[in-house]
């Protein structure tokens, strides 16, 4: 079954300019669920400070948002070739080194998702016809390629952090 589990899911925060659109492709029935969270400091039962994630209620310039996409194989067969693509929302900057995802190969795009590669290999055009190495602030998309097959009923999780401009 090719691409039978493609699902688009948008997360729109109260600030209309902050959004993410995750897509999943696979040989199987993959369902994705995305969430935008902020890390907050709370006092636990022992009176100690600890960090906790909560859904974003308000994102203001300078604040950090964590985008997480959970993907689940809802089919009866293992799903292969699982790929999660996520654009970096407009008016945000990717936090270098923040992309995560167990059992995934992570690549980036600096040209609107046309091409993906490792950060050190990405180049962007600059005025005058020259090129320079892309920096995290230039990244437009992140791609996670799940390594191996995702068993029926199993779930994976990928994500990244951004700072609101």
Predicted segments with their positions:
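Bacterial N-terminal signal peptides
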Residues: 8-17
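N-terminal secretory signal peptides that target proteins for export/translocation
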Residues: 1-2
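Exported/extracytosolic protein signature
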Residues: 5, 21-165
């Amino acid at each position: 079954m090719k691409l039978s589990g493609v699902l688009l899911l948008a997360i729109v925060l109260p600030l209309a300019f902050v959004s993410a659109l995750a897509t999943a492709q696979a040989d199987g029935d993959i369902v994705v669920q995305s969430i935008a969270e902020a890390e907050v400091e709370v006092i636990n039962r022992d009176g100690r400070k600890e960090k906790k994630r909560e859904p974003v209620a308000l994102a203001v310039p300078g604040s950090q948002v964590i985008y997480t996409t959970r993907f689940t194989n809802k089919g009866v067969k293992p799903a292969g070739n699982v790929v999660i693509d996520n654009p970096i929302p407009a008016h945000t900057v990717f936090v270098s080194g923040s992309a995560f995802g167990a059992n995934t190969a992570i690549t980036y795009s600096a040209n609107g998702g046309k091409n993906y590669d490792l950060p050190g290999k990405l180049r962007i055009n600059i005025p005058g016809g020259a090129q320079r190495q892309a920096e995290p602030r230039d990244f437009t998309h992140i791609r996670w390629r799940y390594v191996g097959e995702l068993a029926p009923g199993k779930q994976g999780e990928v994500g990244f952090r951004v700072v609101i401009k």
